[in-house]
């Protein structure tokens, strides 16, 4: 038997050495590939996208609708995280759950707060509170079958919205008969235009739908939102020309459009020089018992009395088809002390006109007034 090595001529390469070299090259290439792939994954932006998507899936149990958030905020990336609820002295939204979605640098975001109906004081506070001390707040209905309202945050072009979702499977539970979803936005671009307002409203109601499923609230959804009413918070309507929430009131006013499902309505009665004399509001559903917890109403508004007049606050109520009585209230605003209405007759008349029309619109009866 002839040794293989004897058949190889002097100077021929060693086959074993060649195989070893190829093996080393393959190992080196594999090591380079193992090291390079994570780098490519990271620097290509795929890693950031993966992290963003993973965070959004865990935020508010994945209920936040992010399909239009980038356009809404004016950012290229969004990431989400849950937030601990504020348990301070003032009622704040988010006692059930709270989260935020926005740019990783924190310069633009939307916060989502979830509350059961028994904690409605927090959502009302975050929506604006409607304290008797300020000439602010104009709830605009989302319409399209949604029990929700939209407003601009005072002094900004940012938006806030709240939606009430009655839970058909929780009707007998006084604390959680409905789910309240409150969304606040802070963008790098204005949210004041029609397209942005509609985008914000769509994100709010879609998030509310998702949250109702995640928190076991069997609710009926409204329709698709293509547009929402324009903001009229600073639009003065001449005397006798009111067509919305102030219709029937003969003075100059500021008002919003009406909707039979709006849980909050506002009408501002103006003096001759355009200064607000008093704000008349309607509250339905869980917001009725939430108002006395707002700053300025403690010891003044008695929710157990169907009607009253105390310390410059007039209120009445009506029995509604669902969720008890509605509240109709008029508060005198700063700068209104010099108005000519010594007996309050004009204010009582305006409250009566407002309450009669609002209660009829919502199908309520047994209206009682001071």
Give the location of each predicted region.
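Hydrophobic membrane-insertion alpha-helices, especially the h-region
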Residues: 14-45
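General secondary-structure edge motif
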Residues: 40, 48-49, 191, 338
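Extracytoplasmic low-complexity, Pro/Thr/Ser/Ala/Gly-rich segments
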Residues: 42-128, 219-270, 342-345, 354-355, ...
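Short, solvent-exposed recognition patches
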Residues: 76-153, 250-333
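A compositionally biased, intrinsically disordered/low-complexity signal enriched
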Residues: 99-101, 110-112, 161, 167, ...
